[in-house]
Amino acid sequence: MPRRGDHLSDLFGLVHRLEGMSTLWNNILHYLRQIPELETARLFLPGSLQAQQLSHSFADSGIPAGEVCLLSLLSLRRLSRTCSYPDCRTQLRHSNLQR
């Protein structure tokens, strides 16, 4: 079984190929670079056709810790009002430490 780092390289390659399509891909690439190798990746993608295609690519990547969720615009707006990235990341680390 390949190491997780190999899968991350595949994901970076995928996102690099797609990043010219819209700023969504640039944001995803920026997010992936912030994730430590052993931390779970959780991506919330809008329910667009491009995001659905990307979610299928992540599902086939073989990264068991990766999670891709398609959200409706309403859910995305609600999430953006109730959650700021640095705080969520801190909560994620705390929940991982408690496990």
From Swiss-Prot:
Protein name, UniProt field: Uncharacterized protein ORFC2
Organism this protein belongs to: Goose circovirus (GoCV)
